């Protein structure tokens, strides 16, 4: 009973004034940890499970179309029967795309239940367990216990805050993993599974228009329209599991949010992860997180020459 009261009191203090200290970690440590997360991402797609059709290069200054076909010419949909993918896809209809509209789109009970199931699985996954143990070993306050870690992951990613009109209309998860409409354009949406689902649902009126940057089957920045609204360059990691993206992005957010990028490397290809926080009512939320391509290297080309 005493331990329960202590835990509740800790969460009460956290809820009242949320300030996450800067994390003193070197670039080499982040690089090594990112590669470790990739190694344990056993739910990511194998190279033979995804085939991309990038088609034409395009630019961000207009809405020109350099792609007549879909981006994904092949995806082994057995991937989507894995629990994290299935639970993620179940969450996709919970959100109002337009900013300024109060969330959730479904009942609060349904949202709480589906988010809870997703977090239950993700927090027990290998990438998130590795991340928790790493933070705990380094004494980060987000990982003093599994309960505190869950609180912060839920707060940073799923708690609602306002992006427009002062209404609780968004969350870090919605922005990064789902996508939003603001000021007549698409904002956020940095996940390959979401891209694939929208591209293969005719009712979404989704049109891929070409790439601005591509790094084989690892990462790309893509132009598209969604129900007539333009996204000039939306960047995604390709083939990664939902739990990997959440673990990597959480690590980078807590370590390098703001002006610094989180520099990582996958399959020989350098990438940067950019992240921003939003503070409202003394609480901290994920504002945005997205990958960008680093300089193309001979190692990147050599390791991915068959992709």
Curated annotation (Swiss-Prot):
Catalytic activity: a ribonucleotidyl-ribonucleotide-RNA = a 3'-end 2',3'-cyclophospho-ribonucleotide-RNA + a 5'-end dephospho-ribonucleoside-RNA
Domain EndoU stretches: 26-295
A Pfam family it matches: XendoU
Glycosylated residues in this chain: 201
Nucleotide-binding among keywords: no
Molecular function in Gene Ontology: lyase activity; metal ion binding; RNA binding; RNA endonuclease activity
Stretch forming the signal peptide: 1-17
Segments forming a coiled coil: none
Cofactor dependence: Mn(2+)
Record key words, sorted: Endonuclease, Glycoprotein, Hydrolase, Lyase, Manganese, Metal-binding, Nuclease, RNA-binding, Secreted, Signal
Keyword Manganese: yes
GO terms for cellular component: extracellular region
Chief location of this protein within or outside the cell: secreted
Compartment annotation: Secreted
EC number: 4.6.1.-
InterPro entries per record: ENDOU (IPR039787), EndoU-like (IPR037227), EndoU_C (IPR018998)
Enzyme active site: 175, 190, 231
PANTHER family assigned: PLACENTAL PROTEIN 11-RELATED (PTHR12439), URIDYLATE-SPECIFIC ENDORIBONUCLEASE (PTHR12439:SF11)
Family designation: Belongs to the ENDOU family.
Function: Catalyzes RNA cleavage releasing a product with a 2',3'-cyclic phosphate at the 3'-end.
Quaternary context: Monomer.
Protein name: Endoribonuclease endu-1
């Amino acid at each position: 009973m005493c331990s329960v009261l202590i835990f509740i009191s800790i969460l009460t203090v956290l809820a009242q004034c949320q300030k996450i200290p800067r994390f003193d970690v070197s670039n080499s440590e982040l690089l090594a940890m990112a590669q470790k997360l990739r190694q344990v991402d056993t739910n990511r797609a194998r190279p033979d499970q995804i085939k991309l059709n990038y088609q034409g290069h395009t630019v961000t200054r207009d809405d020109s179309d350099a792609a007549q076909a879909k981006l994904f010419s092949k995806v082994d949909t057995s991937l989507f029967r894995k629990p994290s993918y299935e639970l993620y896809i179940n969450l996709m209809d919970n959100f109002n795309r337009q900013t300024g509209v109060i969330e959730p789109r479904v009942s609060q009970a349904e949202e709480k239940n589906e988010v809870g199931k997703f977090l239950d699985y993700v927090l027990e996954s290998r990438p998130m367990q590795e991340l928790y143990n790493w933070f705990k070993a380094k004494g980060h306050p987000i990982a003093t216990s599994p309960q505190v870690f869950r609180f912060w992951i839920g707060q940073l990613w799923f708690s609602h805050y306002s992006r427009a009109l002062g209404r609780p209309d968004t969350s870090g998860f919605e922005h990064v993993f789902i996508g939003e409409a603001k000021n007549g354009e698409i904002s956020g949406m940095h996940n390959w599974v979401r891209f694939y689902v929208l591209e293969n649902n005719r009712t979404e009126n989704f049109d891929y228009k070409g790439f601005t940057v591509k790094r084989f089957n690892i990462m790309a920045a893509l132009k598209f329209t969604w129900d007539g609204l333009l996204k000039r360059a939306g960047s995604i990691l390709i083939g990664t599991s939902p739990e990997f993206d959440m673990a990597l992005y959480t690590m980078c957010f807590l370590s390098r949010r703001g002006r610094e990028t989180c520099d990582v490397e996958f399959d020989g290809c350098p990438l940067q992860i950019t992240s921003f926080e939003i503070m409202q009512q003394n609480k901290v939320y994920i504002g945005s997180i997205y990958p960008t391509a680093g300089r193309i290297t001979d190692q990147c080309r050599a390791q991915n020459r068959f992709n």
